[in-house]
């Protein structure tokens, strides 16, 4: 079966697409990889050393004045002046 001759522009586009794919695959191959067991150990280490106060049974409650999110929430509130609600409908 004779190979059909493609116009040069289409050949160039095919070559460019192939080169882009090749470069993408080279970048993916060069990316640092770790094994699943090392990733799990890293997650376990992170969760055992960083306190998560969303789980008070494990880490306890935050000390007063330690929660910087609460301070910013109090500063943002004076706009409406309503305690216990998020907005005021007029």
Curated annotation (Swiss-Prot):
Keyword Lipoprotein appears in the UniProt entry: yes
Lipid moiety-binding region (S-farnesyl cysteine): 87
Propeptide: 88-90
SMART domains attached to this UniProt entry: G_gamma, GGL
InterPro entries named among the record's database cross-references: G-protein_gamma-like_dom, GGL_sf, Ste18_fungal
Cellular compartments per GO CC: heterotrimeric G-protein complex
Keyword list, A-Z: Lipoprotein, Membrane, Methylation, Palmitate, Prenylation, Transducer
One GO term (biological process): pheromone-dependent signal transduction involved in conjugation with cellular fusion
Pfam families attached to this UniProt entry: G-gamma
Disulphide bridges: none
Gene3D superfamilies to which the protein is assigned, alphabetical: Transducin (heterotrimeric G protein), gamma chain
Localisation per UniProt entry: Membrane
Cysteine methyl ester: residues bearing it: 87
Membrane topology designation: Peripheral membrane protein
GO-annotated molecular function: G-protein beta-subunit binding
Domain of life, source organism: Eukaryota
Lipid-bearing positions (S-palmitoyl cysteine): 86
Family: Belongs to the G protein gamma family.
Assembly and binders: G proteins are composed of 3 units, alpha, beta and gamma.
Name of the protein this chain belongs to: Guanine nucleotide-binding protein subunit gamma
